Amino acid sequence: TGLAIKGRRADVDTGRPGPRVAILGELDALIVPQHPFADATTHAAHACGHHAALNAMLGCAEVLTRPEVLSQLSGSLAFIATPSEECQNQPYIASLIEAGKLQLFGGKSELIAEGVFDDIDVAMMLHAGGANYTPSGFNGFVMKRLVFHGKSAHAGANPDKGVNAISMMRPALTLMDAQRDTFRDEAHVRLHGYIPEGGEAVNVVPDRAVFTLQVRAASPEAIQDASDKVDRCVKAVAIAFGGETEVQNIFGFMPLIAYDELDDVHQRNVQAIAPGAPFTRGIYRPSSTDMGDVSMIIPSLHGYFRGFAGTAHTDDFLVADAQQAYVDSAKMLAMDAIDLLWGDASCGRKIAALKCPMNKQTYLEKMRGFSSTLTFGKD
């Protein structure tokens, strides 16, 4: 218990040799006050369907731990409930990292660092959606906190004595927008953020402004390239205004890669449970998930199941078909695990032997290497 502060893990061993398969479910909700099922106090709502995906894990566990099923399997199972996939309260997470309570930004990333996945050979999870499919990949991302330090002054009497931090921020954002043509299409680069700080009073030249930015891309190299370009834009305005800028980098998630052999297993089971229903492969998602981190070091499945309607992360994302959302999803995940561990677990052994892009050490080195603080101006 207490994995990545809020995570949980339970293990079941068949008593016969074979791979250890992890079945994952995500715990966190989103702050969506207008969602019809939002909590009255916290405004949290399952507007990404994690409750249904966690239900799939629990339903899968209920089936696989039955003696008549477990006796036909080899190897072992780890059921892992993972926190903090949505990365919502970024300052809070950053404070936990600074206090030494966490090492990395995402829940699964932290579990990797803690060694929770050290004994896992294959990892699988499903996610709620409006269709059955497996993506070809996801973007990874780095979180950037851009702090613009100017100089306060009376905004009416003598603004010439100040350095307006908002005026520093504006051309920095324009320069970032001008960089978009330099991003390769296949890199799927996304730059997006918001302004949490921008002054305290209308008649004071703001001496501090903050822009929180997420840089997403399809590979660690593309993330680094886009991140470096943002840094140069921020450096340029520090020089131009004679102020100071600070860039705080915390690496978020790695890109997700798909394993065709594991997707093959899942596709067969989806089509057995929902014959005639559409199933799609190869959809690239420019969003991000910390399952990408797991996929870097362990053969992984991140499939989607139907049963929801509306737009994820909004107030209209709701269960449209309870059978599909809660029952079929659990069946799919259970059948995937059974296929991997059935008999002598030969299928699972083959998938466990697939080559991954990184080992744990390389992964941690890259994650920590991205995290840094840079300052520009006033040398």
Regions found by a protein language model. Give the residues of each.
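Midchain, well-structured core segments that form catalytic/ion-binding scaffolds
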Residues: 112, 117-264, 268-270, 283-292
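Short coil/turn connectors at secondary-structure junctions
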Residues: 4, 16-21, 42, 71-77, ...
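Acidic/histidine-rich catalytic neighborhood of metal-dependent amide-processing enzymes
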Residues: 55-137
